[in-house]
């Protein structure tokens, strides 16, 4: 029998129950607890339903030109509209820390508690809440102790890796990367080595700490070698010390983004990756080199080119005219031997690693993607690659990993763009794949083979047209 003293109680309880169901549909609590946990809190993406009150950002003139070349009109572009400041303010008013904003995903990443998530879900402008995927980075570079020595030619010991991908031919034609802007995203960058002191750095951003210092800033960072990996990677592109070491695209302009925090248990955060990518694109990057990858929490079925946040970010960047180059991964000898995100993107150039003689490195990750596409795209020297020793201002080392193969290809891309400035991002990618050493017999070990930069610039070019 109905209690007439509380005539509205049941409808109210029903409404509350329905609201709870709606809120829970916005997120999977177990998924957030399993994946998003960071210490006592959780790191999650908040996806918004719209961009209400958004305004367009101001992008570099180079960005406008690059987009136009790729058929993209900047005026009114949705990707340039900021995330709603009103929505962010309402989230911040709860005392929640906002880590990153993504115009491309129309989302922000935050650090919060589980009870915060319940309150956030009640906002009508929240479309979905997902955990930020992180990666507990395992050693992906082999660090042998080799005494440096040089040869009697200008490239020094870098000659072999330069000749293997036929970059020397482009250097001889005067293509050294001049006028091309490269974004390198990594752990940090120490620019005190003799081979790096003269590089043309346009801007730097530490995404982790939100400042402009990408070298080690703390004793803890120095102790764990925060900027070691990034410095070695950068040197293969930008290094220039005549007779000792010459990188692939030493005359290029550089944007440097520090997107990893190796002092933490979770070192690679996908929201930092996307933030760095958006920053580079709006600041005129023509090429992106990322020797970073994400595997934890993903299944092979997720390597379909459409699932991982970093993969989606890369596809957007390429759509805006940026050539994105990424390491295939170093899982070739493990139970998971496939490529890792964002190498599964259908627009990226993923890079495998080979020895000096062209044999595949055992650690180099394989394809195919879950939907059957060949991976990697191409290969370059990733076993005993010659680069600067980040612990010294004068010495060099031989290091191994697809992390070292990736920047060699990214540097070559810069030379191709310099030689063929009218080519779109996908035309550059096609040229690289179709002129590689195994283009007629591509496989999921080598992809389309070892890059041939000298042939790539002539792909599809009619004789006498230059």
What do these predicted ranges mean?
Residues 233, 273, 277, 285-388, ...:
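Catalytic-core segments of hydrolase enzymes
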Residues 15-24:
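Hydrophobic h-region of N-terminal signal peptides that target proteins for export
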